[in-house]
């Protein structure tokens, strides 16, 4: 089927195509407004790119062929060897999981057939959310609702621009919004180590407030804010290094807000028991909803992490970190952490899937590896079997689920390279078992 959004440049019909409304697979926001040119197989981002998307789309692929222990083979031979290794394994581990919806479905099917464990490489950050959602629940917004309606944003943590370079441009300070419901000026508050005030500008941004503190102090600051909102006296002069007077000022901002959003990115909250910080953020939202409209917004989800968790949930009934050793899915967020299992020597084969970024390497391990990776993937040691695969949204069409978990977006085939889909390779391995 021809892509209606792709058009050939006049006078250069054979070698030059322009793709409009391209969805970028290189971060969890899945920005879908890019324009990308394909000239003789080389891609160039022409509009609405960021550093992450430009690096991803414009990366030159090195020559890559299927290999068995470093020796070039055909894809059929690599599939046969991978199937033999998986069939012999007592406890195969299916990790990485940087793929699209179809690839994740195929990974779960193969893991079920092989009696393996399934866990995404970035699930440690995700479980900072899952533990709170499972135990207490929450009220969340979406990227679109935040963009269109928020008049107060409280950004918890830092490095959001590193995860999502266009978050502030597209969501916090967009040039326009729907329905003309956005406040004329929105206030942005930063609580964390590196306030990103310089990233927030534009006609819709009014005041920006920075409450700098260490990441391990964010929970204390949020706790003091919740106490003051509920009318409790705080005897200390500071909380988390922030003067109580500044926290009182934030209380007034919260009370004046018509649609407030608390934003956090679990991958940036890298500290022991970070779920307690997430719990304070979502608890703040619950407190404020007693009298007004407030919501949370969790970011992250790069490398297909949100997609993997969503597919796992609707296929098995459980989030990631499940085992099919018994023939049915068994969920244990501690026991089935692949990183922990590799350190403890509990797996005898690692099947690693990394189809998006070349830096998404497996951990160093003595366990034999079957790798489905984008060409140029940086491996800590040679794989028993390596099979180059295409990147969804670049080398083939597909679907990914956005970081706010409310929509799956279609990915176009930009025809960079003729590489197989993860889903097809995994299906071939399963058929060969």
Predicted segments — roles?
Residues 110-117, 283-291:
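Short helix-loop-beta junction
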Residues 1-227, 266-267, 431:
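N-terminal export/assembly segments and adjacent metallocofactor-ligating motifs
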Residues 130-289, 324-433:
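Non-catalytic alpha/beta scaffold blocks inside enzyme catalytic domains
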Residues 16-33, 270, 299-317:
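N-terminal, charge-rich interaction modules
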Residues 92, 235, 291-294:
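Generic macromolecular interface patches on structured domains
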């Amino acid at each position: 089927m021809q892509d209606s959004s792709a058009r050939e440049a006049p006078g250069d019909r054979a070698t030059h195509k322009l793709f409009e409304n391209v969805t970028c697979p290189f971060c969890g926001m899945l920005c879908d407004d890019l324009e990308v040119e394909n000239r003789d197989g080389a891609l160039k981002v022409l509009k609405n790119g960021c550093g992450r998307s430009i690096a991803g789309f414009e990366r030159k692929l090195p020559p890559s062929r299927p290999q068995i222990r470093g020796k070039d083979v055909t894809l059929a031979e690599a599939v046969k060897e991978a199937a033999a290794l998986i069939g012999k394994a007592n406890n195969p581990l299916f990790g990485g999981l940087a793929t699209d919806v179809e690839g994740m479905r195929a990974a779960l099917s193969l893991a079920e057939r092989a009696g393996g464990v399934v866990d995404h490489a970035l699930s440690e950050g995700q479980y900072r959310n899952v533990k709170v959602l499972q135990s207490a629940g929450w009220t969340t917004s979406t990227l679109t609702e935040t963009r269109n309606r928020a008049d107060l944003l409280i950004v918890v943590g830092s490095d959001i621009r590193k995860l999502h370079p266009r978050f502030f441009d597209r969501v916090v300070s967009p040039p326009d919004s729907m329905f003309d419901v956005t406040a004329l000026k929105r206030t942005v508050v930063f609580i964390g180590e590196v306030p990103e005030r310089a990233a927030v500008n534009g006609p819709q941004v009014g005041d920006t407030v920075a409450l700098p503190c260490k990441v391990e102090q964010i929970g204390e600051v949020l706790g003091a804010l919740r106490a003051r909102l509920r009318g409790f006296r705080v005897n200390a002069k500071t909380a988390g290094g922030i003067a109580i007077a500044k926290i009182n000022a934030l209380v007034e901002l919260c009370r004046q807000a018509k649609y407030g959003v608390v934003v956090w990115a679990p991958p940036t909250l890298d500290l022991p028991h970070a779920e307690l910080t997430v719990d304070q953020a979502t608890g703040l939202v619950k407190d404020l909803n007693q009298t007004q409209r407030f919501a949370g917004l969790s970011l992250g989800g790069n490398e297909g992490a949100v997609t993997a968790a969503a597919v796992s949930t609707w296929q098995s009934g459980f989030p990631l970190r499940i085992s099919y050793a018994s023939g049915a899915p068994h969920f244990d967020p501690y026991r089935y952490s692949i990183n922990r299992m590799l350190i403890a020597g509990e797996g005898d084969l690692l099947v690693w899937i990394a189809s998006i970024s070349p830096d998404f390497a497996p951990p160093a391990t003595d366990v034999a590896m079957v790798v489905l990776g984008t060409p140029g993937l940086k491996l800590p040691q040679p794989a028993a079997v390596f099979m180059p695969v295409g990147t969804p949204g670049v080398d083939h069409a597909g679907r990914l689920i956005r970081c706010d978990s409310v929509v799956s977006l279609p990915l176009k085939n930009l025809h960079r390279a003729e590489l197989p889909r993860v889903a097809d390779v995994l299906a071939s391995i399963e058929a060969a078992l």
